Amino acid sequence: MTWTHLPLGNKTSRFTQSALALMIAGTLPAYAGTFNPRFLEDVPGIDQHVDLSMYESNKAEHLPGKYRVSVVVNEKKMESRTLEFKAATEAQRAKMGESLVPCLSRVQLEDMGVRIDSFPALKMAPPEACVAFDDIIPQAASHFDFADQTLIMSFPQAAMKQTARGTVPESQWDEGVNALLVDYNFSGSNASYDAHDSETSYNSDSYYLNLRSGMNLGAWRLRNYSTWTRNDGNNTWDNIGTSLSRAIVPLKSQLTLGDTSTAGDIFDSVQMRGVQLTSDEEMLPDSQRGFAPVIRGIAKSNAEVTVEQNNYVIYRTFVQPGAFEINDLYPTSNSGDLTVTIKESDGSEQKFVQPFSSVALLQREGHLKYSLFAGEYRAGNYNSAEPKFGQLDAMYGLPYGFTVYGGAIFSDDYYSLAGGLGKNFGYIGAISIDVTQAKSKLANEENSEGQSYRFLYSKSFNSGTDFRLLGYKYSTSGYYTFQEATDVRSDADSSYSQYHKRSQIQGNVTQQLGAWGSVYFNVTQQDYWNDEGKQRSLNAGYNGRIGRVNYSVAYTWTKSPEWDESDRLLSFSMSIPLGRVWSNYHLTTDQHGRTNQQLGVSGTALEDHNLNYSVQEGYGSNGVGNSGSVNLDYQGGVGSASLGYNYNRDGQQVNYGLRGGVIAHSEGITLSQPLGESMAIISAPGARGAHVINNGGVEVDWMGNAVVPYLTPYRETEVSLRSDSLNNQVDLDTASVNVVPTRGAIVRARFDTRVGYRVLMNLTQANGKAVPFGATATLLDTTKESSSIVGEDGQLYISGMPEKGALQVNWGKDQAQQCRVAFTLPEQQDNTGVVMANAVCR
């Protein structure tokens, strides 16, 4: 046997081109009908007695057996599966014109959406037995497109389950693999400050670590949420909570044990430790689903923005001058308002409170949403009593667009009952009104009783206006929420009673202006019974575009009871594209007339555009002077990293961060980008370096694994590898896999890889003639699957070949139309090309 190494970059002979063309053609759909062998009479090297019947795409006869097929049911594509096909009966041939029909069991038909209970013959059949579906179900039919390997099933609508648009069958939901995981987010900053107009100077170091660790075991999810902060040498470690949860699929609910928070639809949400059973609307299709808030603000300089909830820092980021938006808060809970702090580069701070509210309470007709809680109250990161309590919430959709809802909270020193009604008035919008009656025992055994009234409204207009009055709420002086009553009872001398809420209003308006952009207006106000001041904030802005130039104008106004004056900021921003680079300009001015201007460039780099960079230079009035910054953010396959430097007249700061995840599973330890809630582990043995589509920087590691983060639970997601990124010794049977993770699942996306040499053989028979065109060659190896078709002049291109083995070659059913090739590849071959060989088939 003679071997030659053929580099892919060199010109190939016509024989090589023919074989490679045959390989490529084999991957394309075939549309030919019956093939006439007479066309091959004058082609040298082709046996006129070769049996081509198996390649005739529309021939009436195909061999029964198991085929891997794509399944389409009533024009809806389902997942691919391996099915057994049997020869059609005469009646089936006459009815459907098919030579092969699928052998489908009762279970498989149910997975396809057939209403089994409507057909007694199906209901009585053994679960895995092949049934005559076309006889049992009137007008049912199948068509096997052999060329495309696609099974097309057709059933009358009356025989199908009535499923909503977007439904993913529960049989496809994947609880995932057992694994340990850690999702981390570390940030740090080192600053030096030396004021020119005073003798003040200092250095400041700050570090923050956010850890979400856990374990998946079957359907159970164990999670812990902890944070660590270090400010100027002072360390703080907070164990925010640990929980154990799982899906209860028959109830479309989620069971949680441990640290969690109550629902915030009817009562104010509070942190708790105990047992929770709540409806999980993610299990419903998109068309049947009924909010973490978006935080907007303006930074005067390169600033650090932190978000606190219940005195815990739950989010921290660094922003550039101008208007910013935070829309990726991790949904830890909906308990408590959010305190946002903007720390400017000169050390000054802005603070405002972002209320955490919901829209009008509505449910679809016949749909019940409920929550059950039992446990003890947790105050968060401050001292308070922790009484035991129970809570029940329920909302039910009635006919004619009505929704009725209510709930109750019971504790030794507190009880509350709530009831309300919501209505979708169509063009007018959605409105809900409710009242809550509460009785509280405060400090010194003092009893207090009162009511709270709430009005919620939301409406989107065809003109592009989205108007939401996310609440007007008024409470009498005797009304206390469960959290207020508990905190006041814990310490009557504290400032808790100062923030006894009286009324709250929040409104959001967004107007789309088509080609002219959009405007938004957000306003909140909250006042208290024991304080004359009011917490107020206003955000307004306009986003527009002229040609390829983007620009925006934003205004913020905030006022707190403890402040002598309000904070007011006005900003203007503009971005101009310069190829792959953007030129940016930002202008901000405050209530004292102090302005800050920034001019710079930003863009992306690298093949996957996963390196973001920006360079800014600025100047501030009123003695602020020059400032500038450089920022880099890299999103790699095993994590993300950021690095920034900024300076002004009074000091300089370096900030940096690392974000990512680690998963330990049965096939190795895999590093990842930040994980999110649900994710997939790609398993592609031997495909090291292969890139994952639509996930910048993610590629398969040396163990054949990669993590695709941030999957949507209970939704089908396509996970794909870039075929052009595979090395020359790896081939894929399919470049994409569909997965449907449950909440918190780590699902396996397994790719069937063929790892080995790519070989081009010139095959001759023992009599010296070339092996006939159209013969099939199959690798005889129990651990590998590889096959191909012989081209003209006996040329065979086949991939995934081991260094040593044998091929079985067939071009007919007779013994004389079969032979075997034993081969041994050279011990050393690089992986940049195709190995050529001359071999005798015996």
Which residues are covered by each model-predicted region?
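Conserved, compact domain cores that house catalytic/ligand-binding motifs in diverse enzymes
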Residues: 104, 172-232, 368-439, 603-611, ...
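Feature captures outer-membrane beta-barrel proteins of Gram-negative bacteria and organelles
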Residues: 173, 205-218, 238-251, 386-400, ...
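Short, ordered, surface-exposed loop/turn motifs in non-cytosolic proteins
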Residues: 63-88, 686-696, 767-782
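Post-signal-peptide, soluble extracytosolic/periplasmic N-terminal scaffold domains
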Residues: 2-13, 19-289, 591-663
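Transmembrane beta-strands of outer-membrane beta-barrel pores
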Residues: 159, 188-192, 219, 228-232, ...
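Short, acidic Ser/Thr/Gly-rich low-complexity loop/linker segments typical of extracellular
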Residues: 82-83, 90, 697-705, 783-795
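Short Pro-Gly-centered beta-turn/loop motif in secreted/extracellular proteins
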Residues: 95-104, 329-335, 705-731, 792-815
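A short, amphipathic beta-strand motif
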Residues: 71, 297, 680-684, 757-765
